[in-house]
Structures are given as structure tokens and as C-alpha cells.
């Protein structure tokens, strides 16, 4: 499967995808989507648009000079088919890709190394130039503390209500037990009285 690269943004163009424009001199231009085709027709410069690979390479955001990138160059030299050569080539391609990814990660980490300190310096300068921001921050913190305190109070009230409900339920259960005991005693007394009356009548 032959995978071409977009003439404008350098994205991969897979078979049955993209747009191809053939100029009068038989030069082919392949585009990954209509956005790139439209920009090409408008004669836009890819180095001036931030979403293209050309801009990222020109701005130093991507790895440009590296030995692993030379393996991707096209070589129009016919080579006689050899099974062992194909196997070793495939293994080498996988290894080269792994090395390239490692170097790209290292390049990115090296490029992003001083960003944290720069951001802190910018924030410090912003606060020094606009001291009213600290007051706004104090107000926000105070409101946050008030909301937290209100939430805790509401939770405490809910817990107290639950405890009161449990206590009232316990009291009601105790009253019911007392009533049931008193009813049982009264029934016992009635049975005893009936037995006494029966014994008197029999006498």
C-alpha cells in the first residue's frame, strides 16, 4: 500500500482518500482534504499557517535534523527481490521507528523544560502590575470558606435531625413495648378473675 504525503500540510494520504491535482506540466499535487486544496489554490504559504508540518519544522517545534529521518527518503533505485533482505529491512524499519519516537519525546521534553519557570515569572509580573487581583482572590477565598462552613453546618443539622428521629423511634418502640406488657398483664388479671368466679360458682 502506497501512502503519499499531503503537498500542503504533510499529513498522510491513504489510497482512495484525498484529492489529486495534476498541473499542465504533469506534476501531481496530492491533498489530504479540501481545506489543504483550497489553501493551495489561494497560494497560501504553508510556513505561515500554524497547523502545517512546515510551520512546526520552521518554528523549531519538531525534530528536523536527525539520522533517523534520512531513512524515510525516497530512493528510485530498483533492488532485486530477496526474502532475507525484506525480513531484515522490516526489522530495521521497526527499530528505526522506535528510535525516532524516543528522540522526538526527548526533543519535546527538552523544548518544554523552561516553560514552568517562565509561566511563574509571567504570573508574578501580572500580580505585581495588577495588585487588585489579589483582593479579588481574597474575596473568592472568603466566599469559598463561607460556602464550606455553610455546607458543614447543613451536614451537622442533618446528622442532628437523624439522631432525633432515631431517638423518637426508640421512645415510640419503648412505649409500644410498655403498652403491650400492660395489655398482657391486664389479660392475665382478667383470666385470673374469671377462674375465681368459676371456682366460686362451682362451690
UniProtKB/Swiss-Prot annotation:
GO terms for biological process: assembly of large subunit precursor of preribosome. Its main location: cytoplasm. The keyword Iron-sulfur does not apply. It comes from the Eukaryota. Transmembrane segments: none annotated. InterPro entries: L24e/L24_sf, Ribosomal_eL24, Ribosomal_eL24-rel_N, TRASH_dom. Keywords: Cytoplasm, Nucleus, Ribosome biogenesis. It is found in: Cytoplasm; Nucleus. Residues 191-203 have a biased composition (Basic residues). One of its GO terms (cellular component) is nucleolus. One of its GO terms (molecular function) is structural constituent of ribosome. Disulfide bonds: none annotated. Associated with nucleolar and cytoplasmic pre-60S particles. At the end of biogenesis it dissociates from cytoplasmic pre-60S particles and is likely to be exchanged for its ribosomal homolog, RPL24. Belongs to the eukaryotic ribosomal protein eL24 family. Involved in the biogenesis of the 60S ribosomal subunit. Ensures the docking of DEHA2D15950g/NOG1 to pre-60S particles. Activates and recruits ATPase AFG2 to cytoplasmic pre-60S ribosomal particles. This is Ribosome biogenesis protein RLP24. The gene is RLP24.
